[in-house]
Amino acid sequence: MAEYTKVKSTKLVLKGQKQGKKHKHKDRKRKATDEDEKPDIVGGWWVVKSFVEMNGTVALEMQNNAYIHALDSGLFTLGAPHKDDEGPDPPEQFTTIKLSDSRIALKSGYGRYLGINSEGLVVGRSDAIGPREQWEPVFQDGKMALLAANSCFISYSDSGDIVANSKTAGDEEMLKIRTSAERETRSKDDLAEEDRGNVKSCEVNYVKKFQSFQDRRLRVNEGDSMTLKKARTDGKFHEALLDRRSKMKADRYCK
């Protein structure tokens, strides 16, 4: 366990990565953005885009409509492709257990945890979570791969097994993690409601949130808001707001 905890969060090392051509036309950019934002959902199973979304039951899609399939022998293979509107079969569904802010464990329908053996073969025969049963989903540039405890990415071998043998992530190591968990509708920027709008409206929002209304009057700092605009650009917006509120001596969280 100690050896594995030393492994740092990983970025994808892509094989033969090429930079895409830039589209100067605004309409083309807008079209590409719209396509990127279109949810990838198959039979109620949607693609996970970040670690935060790793919840509940998941399926690992390694090719179009083909998922990692658990065998009763404790081994895994790539299942037969499904129809475009068809989700994964029960042997292709796994339970997610979050172990940290970056690592998970996966439990098959046979009640065993996915891990790797000394040869890098993915197996599901353990009834407990040890160092070999820990996985790190790696997200980068809209792509995703799954890192095993041996610091290798999983892929599908010529012999029909699921293995973790590659230190770099190429097309064969790319996969999609799909989940059937209920989706949370969030705004694209994921900003708090108090942080929306211009700097003055944001300041009013925070004053309403934190001010002690002893005489039921809203006290807002009348100083120049240009300092707030600069602070927002510099990433010190909340510090600046707190400083302005503290000068008004009306915030129960300030001096």
From Swiss-Prot:
Gene Ontology terms describing biological process: muscle organ development; rRNA processing
Motif (Nuclear localization signal): 21-31
InterPro entries: Actin-crosslinking (IPR008999), FRG1 (IPR010414)
Comp. bias intervals (Basic residues): 18-31
Protein localization: Nucleus, Cajal body; Nucleus, Nucleolus; Cytoplasm; Cytoplasm, Myofibril, Sarcomere, Z line
Keyword ATP-binding carried by entry: no
Major site of localization recorded for this protein: nucleus
UniProt motif (Bipartite nuclear localization signal) ranges: 232-248
GO cellular component terms, semicolon-separated: Cajal body; catalytic step 2 spliceosome; nucleolus; striated muscle dense body; Z disc
Record has Metal-binding as a keyword: no
GO molecular function: actin filament binding; RNA binding
Domain of life: Eukaryota
Record keywords, A-Z: Actin-binding, Cytoplasm, Myogenesis, Nucleus, Ribosome biogenesis, RNA-binding, rRNA processing
Span list, region Disordered: 1-36
Similarity section: Belongs to the FRG1 family.
Purpose of the protein: Binds to mRNA in a sequence-independent manner. May play a role in regulation of pre-mRNA splicing or in the assembly of rRNA into ribosomal subunits. May be involved in mRNA transport. May be involved in epigenetic regulation of muscle differentiation through regulation of activity of the histone-lysine N-methyltransferase KMT5B.
Protein name: Protein FRG1
Natural source organism: Takifugu rubripes
